[in-house]
Amino acid sequence: MSKRKEFDEDAPVDPSDLLEFINLGAGNEVGRSCHVIQYKGKTVMLDAGVHPAYTGLSALPFFDEFDLSTVDVLLISHFHLDHVASLPYVMQKTNFRGRVFMTHPTKAVCKWLLSDYVKVSNVGMEDQLYDEKDLLAAFDRIEAVDYHSTIEVEGIKFTPYHAGHVLGACMYFVEMAGVNILFTGDYSREEDRHLHVAEVPPKRPDVLITESTYGTASHQPRLEKEARLLNIIHSTIRNGGRVLMPVFALGRAQELLLILDEYWNNHLDLRSVPIYYASSLARKCMAIFQTYVNMMNDNIRKIFAERNPFIFRFVKSLRNLEKFDDIGPSVILASPGMLQNGVSRTLLERWAPDPRNTLLLTGYSVEGTMAKQITNEPIEIVSLSGQKIPRRMAVEELSFAAHVDYLQNSEFIDLVNADHIILVHGEQTNMGRLKSALASKFHNRKVDVKVYTPRNCVPLYLPFKGERLVRALGKVAVHKPKEGDIMSGILIQKDANYKLMSAEDLRDFSDLTTTVLTQKQVIPFFSSMELANFHLKQMFGYVKQSKTKAGQPQYTVMDAITLTLIQEHKLALEWVGNIMNDTIADSVITILLGIESSPASVKLTSHKCNHLHSHLDKPPKVSKEEDRIKKLMMFLDNQFGESMTKTEKGVEIKFEKYEASIDFSTMKVECSNEALRSRVVHVLSRAINTILPFSEASQNDVSEDDFENEESDDDKIFEQQTKIEDDVKNENKTEPVEEQKSEEKNEQPNLKKEELS
């Protein structure tokens, strides 16, 4: 029989068994997404975007750090610029010779989107990454694929699945030489008005490459989010203001337009307020959305059966900003979403000084962009011409970015169940928080799940053995395993052959024999064995006691680790070497080496010093009673503050017209008002209850003989506390003040140690 061989971390790794992953972009950042996977001589590139905060060559991924001629397949997840805008540069300006794939909607939108990117790029000809000619040449080589269809290229298989981010967005399930990899791209697990949620592939991947855009943040539920969005817009309009919503030309803008169009339809008072979509590109691409309705969810299909939902009833296209009649309230969705330039930046500079207006940020804001800067609500902003403009308009953030939050990401990671998780597409802080959260979550799992956050241009190596045939022999092969059964034994490799057998069969089926390794370690030890026994019991619960042939005490921890005092100040530990015993031994050694510095050890072994030290300065003598009174005063002062006054016998507490007095010699409370008296009695008893255990414990001797005492210190302290609290309450039972005064002269303080014991 045979079984797939799993990777052994302790085994030597052949370089050919290492999967290499490298970020050329989007490593500890958001922008210029580009990732490369190499394994068994095959290379896959995932996405090729630009960084929205930079221009020209500086916006590109670090293509110079990798030989692009080795790339077999380039897979594009969706049409956003930070994932696709450098694709024509790769295909036309480098030595890339591989094949490029994306879904049909992505290819249709990309043609218009990248053409617009070339036109509006705010750079000179010398810094332009590519021109229209390069774009057309590149698109002739791009191949479109359908969801759920498996394509094989040069031994590499990949299947696209719905990602739920924008129309056409997909995640890729890639198979390379027996290793399964899932790349999510940007994805969403929250169903909206027109897109499918991200799918969970039917096969389990070995490696998951997932976004970390929002780290450990949590999104509002969709309905609450929509309600807040509409409330902000409606409130701004009622105040006579304008609403600016910077958006990407395509993607989430269509979702927002669907929400606004429906809201305007249900509110007659808003129909006179115009909604504008300021993007000529979006107008051109709207036909694509109308074409690919069959790739959207059931909600939009039902509406489409009656009318085309993307032919909006209350949304107008703003063709020319110069002809825009900017009078009265309005709502404008304008690109670009990062406010770096274009219509959205022009309107921001125009509307920023008016406090009635609102800037509504609905997407993720990348570091280094105006969208990110204005979230800090600065007093002024700098215009594209360099002028300072006062910022009085309100700034609101509400994420409709269709990225997963922590709960959605964590749930998806659990469903996918990969052993290796690589986080990309996230700022360093968010990515670090997500890694820590996942590491804590996976801490107690039986299978070790590893989480990685590689930086740009820093390769990550993951060891994977390819598929191997393993022969099960001897006792291991007696019972035929069923699907899902786990087989255990010793795996023997000789040349390219693998055999699985039990330890008893090694002599029969191999040239190997077995032996037991006994570990022994000697450590310095300056405490007593009784003290060691005490601390080990605290940790492990049960410690077996015995003696050596020489009569030396010997302890056995967890039936695995044996401790013997071999000579003065030297303690020997012995155990049979294995993972569990080694771990227990490490814990035992740590405890033993820390005994001398343990506060418990100091308390248990401390004794009174009964002789004089004439060479030392004598501290001022403070009686035990004075020390108690001092601590008691501190406690009462914290409770009653300025209401308390010190007297000869104790203290006096005044509250409005009532007075209560405490006599420290008897601990009696006198007061004509029962409510105040009860309060003071309660506080006094709590004070004594708090102070006594520590002051008494610090004065008492504790010998090593106490270790075996069945009555714990906690029990003694509890008895003392109970007795004192009862004494105070009994002494302070309600009695006539005259009778109490007559008895005070003969009473002794009831806090003396002799009475307690």
UniProtKB/Swiss-Prot annotation:
EC number: 3.1.27.-
Gene3D superfamilies the UniProt entry points to: 3.40.50.10890, Ribonuclease Z/Hydroxyacylglutathione hydrolase-like
The UniProt record lists the keyword Manganese: no
Signal peptide bounds: none
Active site positions, chain numbering: 403
Main function: Component of the cleavage factor I (CF I) involved in pre-mRNA 3'-end processing.
Family: Belongs to the metallo-beta-lactamase superfamily. RNA-metabolizing metallo-beta-lactamase-like family. CPSF2/YSH1 subfamily.
Name of protein: Endoribonuclease ysh1
Organism: Schizosaccharomyces pombe (strain 972 / ATCC 24843)
Lineage: Eukaryota, Fungi, Dikarya, Ascomycota, Taphrinomycotina
